[in-house]
C-alpha cells in the first residue's frame, strides 16, 4: 500500500475539507484518516490527512501535486510526511 500523509494549515475559510477530500477522490485515491482543528482565537485551520494512492500511482508525485494545489488554490501551507 502506498500512502501519503499531509499536514495543511492556514487561515480558515469555507470549503477546505471539501476541496481536500474532493481532490483526493479525483485522483482515484482513498482517504484513510483525517483530523482537523480550528484555533478560533487565531483563525488558523489545521488538517492532517492520510490517503492511499490509487494503484500504480507514485506517492511522491501525488504528494507534490497535492502540495501545489493546496498552496495555489487554498493559499495554505503544507507539510508532506
Language-model features, listed with the residues they occupy:
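A conserved regulatory-domain signal marking ACT and ACT-like small-molecule sensing domains
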Residues: 1-81
Amino acid at each position: 500500500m502506498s500512502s501519503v500523509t499531509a499536514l495543511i494549515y492556514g487561515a480558515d475559510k469555507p470549503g477546505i475539507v471539501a476541496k481536500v477530500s474532493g481532490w483526493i477522490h479525483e485522483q482515484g485515491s482513498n482517504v484513510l484518516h483525517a483530523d482537523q482543528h480550528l484555533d478560533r482565537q487565531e483563525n488558523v485551520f489545521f488538517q492532517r490527512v492520510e490517503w492511499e494512492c490509487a494503484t500504480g500511482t507514485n506517492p511522491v508525485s501525488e504528494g507534490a501535486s497535492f502540495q501545489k494545489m493546496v498552496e495555489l488554490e487554498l493559499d495554505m501551507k503544507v507539510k508532506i510526511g
